[in-house]
């Protein structure tokens, strides 16, 4: 937190308390077989020693805002919790650098799309590092997986789950809304909102989606058996996940707004291609962050930027503001929430500095294993003090 020197409230940056918290070295506090079985989304997930986590990354066309950050801080909390429980997380966080929105942003900037994407990715990674979010083990970029998408398209065609028309390959998606519990009308609305082109006349059904999209003049394109084109959004993620992890993952994580259409089609394509179900043992759909009751959007002028938050508060306070609630909960950002988080962080640090007769940290493990119940874990740590408070601060990246 000293990296945020001069940016936080005095109590939050107390160096004595910081040194107390840092007395905890490492997070592996359980012997093999002794740790509680973690649960995500109410689903118990027994592990031996490794967890495969696919995190839907950014489309690098703009600055990182709080809505983005919330998802990645929660994913970081999940991976740290697993590590604390003796399970090594293997995280794959992709970069969607082949996308219509990115292409349009690069055109407006007068910059080649790949150079534009690389610069935005750099800024994103700087913001994540400033928030204390660990870098993933794997960081695939979509443009490097074009051949894998072509193989995916060919396999779906061979199985009759897709069809080729006018240089594109479409996945039959009528069943996809059911994966998200949606009626057809709502699925069509979301498909249009997220660039699914339900009005494309080449489709057999408006809910079909492009695995391979025929090229348009002046847009990025690659050769394929169906002509020049580019990967579809959902197919990119499916191809990257299957390439990195094989037939499936333990946890697929991302913002709740990605549940449909993106995650539903990604999983459907993966399961259809491999024949293995389920593609994901559990889903971590992080709640949406709004401001003034509205979804953050550049067009609305209401973005809350990570870099602006970190100019006034230490990263630990921003992380605690994000984490001190249920991970699936939607919430509305207000500046006073940061003040409340900073005050709660001071109480946690004070508790960490107290002597406590009981240095057993397993209570923290049980609470975090129970679907990442961070609020209850913080309450317990503040009440108990000592080693549990120090350990929790370490696990949640609040030290």
PLM region spans:
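Alpha-helical recognition segments enriched in aromatics with Gly/Pro capping
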Residues: 11-61, 76, 147-343, 349-356
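Basic, alpha-helical terminal appendages of large translation-related enzymes
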Residues: 1-46, 105, 112, 116, ...
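N-terminal, positively charged nucleic-acid-binding surface of large information/translation enzymes
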Residues: 44-130
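Short, glycine/charge-rich beta-strand/loop segments that flank catalytic centers
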Residues: 95-100, 124, 134-149, 166-175
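Terminal accessory/anchoring regions of large secretory-pathway or extracellular enzymes
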Residues: 349, 362-365
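Extended alpha-helical coiled-coil "stalk/arm" regions
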Residues: 356-362
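Non-catalytic interaction-recognition regions
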Residues: 83, 125-147, 151, 256-259, ...
């Amino acid at each position: 937190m000293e990296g945020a020197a001069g940016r936080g409230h005095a109590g939050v940056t107390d160096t004595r308390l910081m040194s107390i918290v840092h007395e905890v070295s490492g997070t592996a506090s359980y012997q093999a077989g002794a740790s509680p079985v973690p649960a995500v989304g109410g689903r118990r997930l027994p592990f031996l020693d490794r967890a495969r986590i696919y995190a839907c990354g950014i489309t690098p066309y703009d600055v990182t805002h709080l809505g983005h950050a919330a998802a990645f801080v929660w994913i970081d909390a999940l991976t740290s919790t697993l590590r604390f429980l003796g399970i090594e997380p293997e995280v794959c966080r992709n970069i969607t650098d082949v996308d219509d929105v990115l292409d349009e942003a690069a055109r407006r900037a007068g910059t080649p799309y790949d150079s534009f994407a690389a610069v935005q990715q750099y800024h994103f990674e700087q913001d994540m590092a400033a928030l204390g979010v660990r870098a993933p083990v794997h960081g695939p970029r979509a443009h490097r997986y074009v051949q894998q998408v072509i193989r995916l398209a060919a396999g779906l065609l061979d199985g009759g789950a897709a069809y080729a028309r006018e240089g594109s390959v479409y996945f039959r998606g009528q069943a996809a809304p059911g994966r998200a519990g949606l009626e057809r009308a709502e699925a069509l609305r979301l498909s249009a909102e997220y660039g699914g082109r339900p009005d494309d006349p080449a489709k057999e059904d408006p809910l079909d989606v492009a695995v391979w999209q025929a090229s348009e003049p002046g847009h990025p394109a690659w050769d394929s058996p169906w002509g020049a084109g580019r990967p579809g959004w959902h197919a990119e993620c499916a191809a990257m996940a299957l390439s990195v992890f094989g037939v499936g993952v333990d946890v697929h994580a991302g913002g709740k707004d990605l549940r449909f259409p993106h995650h539903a089609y990604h999983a459907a394509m993966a399961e259809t291609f491999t024949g293995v179900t389920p593609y994901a043992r559990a889903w971590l759909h992080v709640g949406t962050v709004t401001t003034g009751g509205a979804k953050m959007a550049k067009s609305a002028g209401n973005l809350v930027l990570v870099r602006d938050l970190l100019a006034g508060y230490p990263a630990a306070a921003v992380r605690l503001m994000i984490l001190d609630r249920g991970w699936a909960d939607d919430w509305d950002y207000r500046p006073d929430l940061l003040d409340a988080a900073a005050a709660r962080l001071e109480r946690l640090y004070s508790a960490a500095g107290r002597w406590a007769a009981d240095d057993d940290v397993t209570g923290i493990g049980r609470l975090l294993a129970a679907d990442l119940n961070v609020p209850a874990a913080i309450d317990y740590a503040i009440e108990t003090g000592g080693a549990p408070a120090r350990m929790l601060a370490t696990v949640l990246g609040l030290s």
